[in-house]
Amino acid sequence: MHKSCIRCLLVATAISAGSLSLAAAPSALSSRAFGDDTKKEKKEEDKYTKFFKDKKVETARGKFVTLHKIDGSVYLELPTKYLGKELMMGAKITSTTDPDYLAVGSMNSAPIVFRFEKQDSVIVMKAPNSIVYRRDASPELQKALELNYRDQSVESFTPEVYKADSSAVVLKINSLVTESSPFFEIVPSQQGPFKITSSRNSSLTFVRGLKAFDTNASVRVEMNFSVNASLMGVLTVAKDMPLTAEVTYTILPVEASNAIPRFADARVGYQTTRKVSFPDYLDQSEPVYLAHRWQLVPKDKKAYAKGQLTEPEKKIVFYLDSAFPASWQRPIREGVLRWNKAFEAAGFRNAIEVRDFPKNDKQFDPDNLEYSCIRYIPNSQETIASSNWTDPRTGEIFSGNLTIYNNVEALMHKQRFIGTAAVDPQVRSSRLPQALFEESLSQLVTQEMGSVLGLLRNYAASASYTTDQLRSAKFTKESGLTPSILDGVTYNYLAQPSDKGVRLINDQLGVYDLFAIDWGYRYFDLKGDPAAEAKELLSRVDKRAREPYLRYAPEQRYAVDPTVRTEDLGNDPIKTAELTMKNLAFIQSNLSKWITNDPDSRKKKSLYLAIVQGYYLQLKNAMSLVGGVVCQESRLSTSLPRYQVVPKAKQREAFQWLLREAKDFQGKADRNFERKGFIDVSYYDQLLEFLVKDIYDLRSRIIIASQVDSKTYSLGEYFDDLYQATFASTIAGKSPNHMERLMQIAFIDKSIAGTVNPRNATPGMPYSFAGAPASVGGKLISLTSTTDYSDALKSGRVNYGGGDPSASIYPMANVPA
């Protein structure tokens, strides 16, 4: 066709189309003008709307995220601005069918920190690898760390739908909240005295509620388990027992932390998070321990710098369960707030507050991670438990809990009766008077609150005062019973009836407690430089390292140090034992007279057992002098000795005293009391074999001490003294008593055990230990290594490896049975 014809045809077509368009316009305009919607074009529904259409949806909307429940499944509507941002999630027990195995308010696994990232078409959940301390790393080192310590991908989620504007993504999160998750242990493996195994019934899992707030959201889920439980792992107390629990899962954003990490010092007892550092000036890595502590910043920094007490910008706030009996609430408050005195030593006024559970605050939820609570558990356990949860990046504590069980009164009565009934007539009954109950409850709360603040128990404190000082009314009024309430001591059990006015309860913060809080919570305006803080803190501890009342020591797994004992008191274990056993004998002789309204003798049985255990504890404390090595964390710059062996004469005195007491141990029993039918089997008789074992277990301690000091009490001298005491009656032509016969059998067994030629065994040290201590020690001893701190102040460097306060500082040895 000719080109001109084609052009004409195209023009005609365009004119025709335009005419049609113009022709349609008036009709459309007319329709709109008269409100006729029948001809509107229906907008296509977006995918987000379609996803929820015609479904039964329960929704909780908040400023942070939105939660949906559809057919028993939980959906998280996450704003895409949070992709790549760190979040935190944890699980708390909300209700239970059996508080003996599952406590309301407890968290049986630490909260997890994670983030969601979009990768291809899925959303990946990643756990930050926070094991490496990366502050101040050079760019080259930072790149190497990123390659070798990358974040872990733990789970993937296929997006259900995005909002139309892509501002949020909807994820099905059943794997985190309604299914068994590796991140959250719901039923603990240990609860009080019970060892527990459990299996979950997935068909009996129900979503009970959703909540969404400005800064967090939560899902409440009912779960059902089959539980097996045993007492101390021996006696089965539950088999395939059904257990129902409601669990609240909380998710919240983790803001970029401005908390300054504080490097732990092994000489000050703080809980820690372990990390690894790669300092530029070292050719190897070193451990870093970040102390756990709440972040406190003074409101008025200028006043604080001048030494004036200042309130913190954000206080440590605890909410008190309204379920507590009215008579419990005041002593609980006092017990918590007692720590404000210690915070004043760090420059803060009113650092801690205790508030009632709010009645009209819709944001408040005691099962929410954002709230720290003191919970009441009405069950048979006789204890107080505590926990805190930290930011793994910095060690900052963001939440804490105290759990107080209903039967704690029974524990307090037992401890106070055994500890003070010899000197305090008020205690001589089946229950504590109200005033003493409140005093005891307040003391226990204060002691447990230390753990919530990040502190560790200090088992060295109770041996700091002399035994005689603890009998002085003036001294104990001014200084308390120990330099730290964090020791295991509760009552002044060595006080005698003649010690008028002496303090009987360990309810006073000591000088160590004030020192420890000052170390952990003092604010330094050093521009957020943890290395500069560490330098200052190391110097402060160095200056006071020789003060005996500030000594800290962690719990011993194997008893080596006689000054670090659970429930010891005073610096002379033998004198303390003699005074205490005098009190125990007096209490035992009056037990039936003082404990009335006890028709089945259950209370008397329990107290009688506690008396026997009290005797045994005193023997063990005195026994710890034999082969005893006093251990102390020290830096090279302080020149303090790490190990000091108990003087030889004192060791031998203690061993001979122990042997005399052991042979007469059965004589302490009240046979008339036992024959009345209260006791099925004598507790004193039951402990005899334990005593024999304890006596022979002293060998390893003596080997350790001999390695530290070759001139100390030796293994040969130990066996000579043991032989003379064991066979004294036989040598004198007398019949040995039951305990002596047990000791003789054990001695013969040990004498021939492991010998090459039993006929060469001689009285005294067994043949298998001939040549000890040197040869025996050389083969069997294994001294633990302790951190040999480099001098952090040299060259202006700070050694981040300030030590782990919970690590053992005690030497160990193994001896053949």
Functional labels for PLM-detected ranges:
Residues 29-324, 342, 357-412, 416-432, ...:
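Auxiliary tRNA-acceptor-end handling modules of aminoacyl-tRNA synthetases
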Residues 34, 356-377, 439-496:
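The catalytic-center signature of Zn2+-dependent metalloproteases
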Residues 83, 325-351:
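Zn2+-dependent metallopeptidase catalytic core
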Residues 328-335, 437, 441, 445, ...:
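Stable alpha-helical elements in mature extracytoplasmic
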Residues 16-26:
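C-terminal segment of classical bacterial N-terminal signal peptides
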Residues 1-10, 17:
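Bacterial N-terminal signal peptides that target proteins for export
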Residues 385, 390, 396-404, 445-453, ...:
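Extended catalytic-interface subdomain
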Residues 462-817:
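Conserved catalytic/binding loops enriched for acidic/polar residues
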